[in-house]
Amino acid sequence: MSPKKIFFTKGVGRHKERLASFEAALRDAGIEKFNLVYVSSIFPPNCRIISKEEGLKFINPGEIVYCVMARQETDEHNRLIASSIGVAIPADENQYGYLSEHHSHGETDEKAGEYAEDLAASMLATTLGIEFDENMGWDEREQVYK
């Protein structure tokens, strides 16, 4: 069983109870109707990214849906938190790529996103035998993958 399509979504939930907050985030993301099963971070070969709207047409309420999820929570008022999924897809569609989850405190969503992308890219680089200098800027590293 290997997915041929994937979509990304995001959500934010606020409530005094953590479970209710998580449910609100799932609703905000549009995936509250599904039984989510977490999987690790492999982007399948020959898989394509589709819109959330298109992806939701393929799944029904109560269905088991496999997902890579980044989740962060806090009970501290005004605490800055972020979570993000990074994706690294090889040029050769027949090879697998990586999805990385990142969860942080005190970091903006933009910084969390950059970190998750870098993490996914570094995991992919190791499988392709590409030297990956973590101290190099993203724009420079991105050229290695093109």
State each model region's role.
Residues M1-K146:
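Helix-coil modules at protein/domain termini and other flexible surface or pore-lining loops
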